[in-house]
């Protein structure tokens, strides 16, 4: 009997050590920053330079007036609760997600690194290169640097949510009823395998006229992620928590399904992460009075 127990214990130890490399691979797949991934091929990156001969969309901003709005939900994820009334000062936000054309101007002017995937994603980059498709494969720092170059900043979570849902606590930019083809998301026959030209879905338009909040690509915002922040944050202009491990992403995308397409849904990722589903837009703490270029 003792010998049998010893054999079982020894077998469990062997299995535990054998599992460690697998666990490491899983952790690496989820958490490894872009810089540790295989190098990007020049051929893959060059595809971004040959964007379609399409006139760039106008670089517009929308001013969101000061006032209260209802943030969060009563029935979503734990980190979306409780539902509370929050006051946000006047700000302006990009009407559209930042496009490839706009980001390429930034790269050309500053020498900032190009958006690009690890080699394992290289085949997909050709489908994301359109002039007016949202730029993707950008980290949180890339997005933040672009906004600063433009004299802007990333929107806070509170600003982003107000801009996309208005003041009446709606679940989607258009209202409270899900529309299968209302935005560019997964598992619908909308004619788009990947991201679409910004503004392609007229229904995906907030009460203020901000486009693509429910679909197309997810968007980096300014905040560090904190699970209980909807409960703990101040009632007026809640800033980002001071520190964290993950940065917040908001909005749905062309790979998004189910509850994640609601405007209240919160996602998170390490700041160095880059892939084809994440883009961004910028904001300013002022009224928009003209050209944003």
Residue ranges of each PLM-predicted region?
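Short, P/G- and charge-enriched loop/turn segments at secondary-structure junctions
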Residues: 49-51, 78-83, 266-271
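Ser/Thr/Pro/Gly-rich low-complexity linker/stalk segments immediately outside membranes or between
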Residues: 27-48, 55
């Amino acid at each position: 009997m003792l010998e049998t127990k010893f054999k079982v214990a020894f077998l469990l130890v062997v299995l535990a050590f054998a599992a460690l490399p697998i666990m490491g691979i899983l952790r690496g797949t989820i958490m490894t920053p872009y810089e540790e991934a295989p190098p990007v091929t020049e051929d893959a990156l060059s595809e971004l330079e040959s964007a379609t001969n399409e006139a760039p969309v106008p670089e517009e901003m929308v001013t969101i007036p000061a006032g209260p709005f209802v943030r969060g939900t009563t029935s979503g994820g734990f980190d979306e609760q409780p539902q509370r009334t929050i006051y946000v000062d006047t700000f302006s936000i990009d009407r559209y997600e930042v496009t490839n054309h706009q980001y390429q101007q930034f790269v050309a002017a500053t020498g900032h690194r190009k958006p690009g995937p690890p080699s394992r994603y290289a085949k997909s980059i050709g489908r994301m290169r359109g002039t007016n498709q949202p730029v993707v494969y950008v980290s949180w720092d890339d997005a933040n640097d672009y906004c600063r170059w433009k004299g802007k900043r990333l929107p806070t979570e509170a600003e982003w949510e107000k801009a996309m849902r208005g003041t009446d606590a709606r679940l989607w930019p258009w209202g409270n009823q899900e529309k299968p083809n209302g935005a560019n998301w997964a598992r619908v026959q909308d004619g788009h395998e990947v991201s679409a030209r910004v503004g392609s879905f007229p229904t995906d338009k907030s009460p203020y006229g901000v486009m693509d909040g429910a679909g197309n690509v997810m968007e980096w915002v300014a905040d560090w992620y904190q699970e209980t922040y909807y409960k703990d944050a101040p009632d007026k202009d809640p800033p980002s928590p001071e520190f964290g491990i993950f940065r917040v992403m908001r909005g749905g995308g062309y790979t998004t399904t189910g509850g994640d397409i609601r405007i209240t849904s919160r996602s998170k990722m390490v700041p160095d992460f880059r892939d084809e589903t994440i883009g961004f837009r910028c904001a300013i703490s002022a009224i928009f009075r003209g050209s944003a270029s």
